[in-house]
Each structure stands twice: as C-alpha cells, then as structure tokens.
Design a protein with these regions (language model features):
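C-terminal substrate-binding subdomain of Rossmann-fold SDR/epimerase-dehydratase oxidoreductases
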Residues: 1-146
C-alpha cells in the first residue's frame, strides 16, 4: 500500500536535492552574514499529485507485475494530528540578491530520484530492514525519546 494521510491535498514546495545543495553553496559564497535566505523552487504540489506522478514514473521504468497500475496501491488513511496543509517559502531574495535559480524541473528531478532508488535498492533496503519500520515518529505513543 501507498498510504496517503487525509485527502492528500497538503501542499509542499518541491526542490531537487542538487539544487538545494547549490543554493546553500551560493549562500556560503555570496551571502551576507546574518541575512536569511529562503530556498525554494516554487514547485508547489499537493501530496496526492506527487504520489501519482511517482506511480506514473514507476510504470514507465518498471511496469507493475501484481497490479495493473501502481496507482491502485494508493490508500487514504486517517490524517495525522497537526498535519500542516501547506509548506512553501518565498525564495525571491536568494534569486534577486544572489542570482540563484533551481536548474532541475520537478518532473525531471523526481524521475532522477526514482531512478536512483531503483538502482540502489540493495543499499537503501538495508537501512529500512534494520532501523526505520515505517512507523509515524514523534507521536504521543512513540518511545523514541526513551
């Protein structure tokens, strides 16, 4: 299953990791001490759209075997407490003052990310097998602080 909390309409601003790293380097190189620079790509997408796009990319790269479509695996579950409806920033300052712009579009960055996960399953499966159990961390019933 691919659990979607609530209706999946929570919005996030998506930024490819290499673009994020480039932005941080740009701040180190040209930023003014004690100034704040918000980093964002203005790629605001709701969670359900992102999951559906991942499903579509997977169908192209690794067609499903046990189902007709990866989208059939999407399951809506109860929303988590305090689930913010939107995370996005105004990144105009880093663009205008430091000349930084993201280079990787949303779809291309997501496809590169999915390809990486498909090519490196042996590496990341070890992490999930031995530590993270896909449980919700930080809820009132967890004992992660014990």
């Amino acid at each position: 299953n691919l659990p979607i909390f609530g209706d999946g309409k929570q919005v996030r601003d998506w930024l490819y990791v290499e673009d994020h790293c480039d932005a941080i380097l740009r701040v180190f190189e040209a930023g003014i001490v004690n100034e704040t620079y918000m980093i964002g790509a203005s790629n605001q997408k709701d969670n359900i759209s992102v999951v559906e796009t991942i499903c579509d990319i997977l169908e192209e790269l690794e067609p499903p075997v046990r189902t007709n479509s990866y989208r059939e695996l999407i399951t809506f579950v109860a929303d988590r407490p305090g689930h913010d409806i939107r995370y996005a920033v105004n990144a105009n300052k880093i663009r205008t003052k430091l000349g930084w712009e993201p280079k990787t579009g949303f779809e291309n960055g997501l496809k590169q990310t999915v390809k990486w996960y498909l090519s490196n399953a042996k590496w990341w499966n070890k992490i999930f097998k031995h530590s993270y159990k896909f449980e919700r961390l930080g809820n009132k019933n967890s004992n992660w602080l014990d």
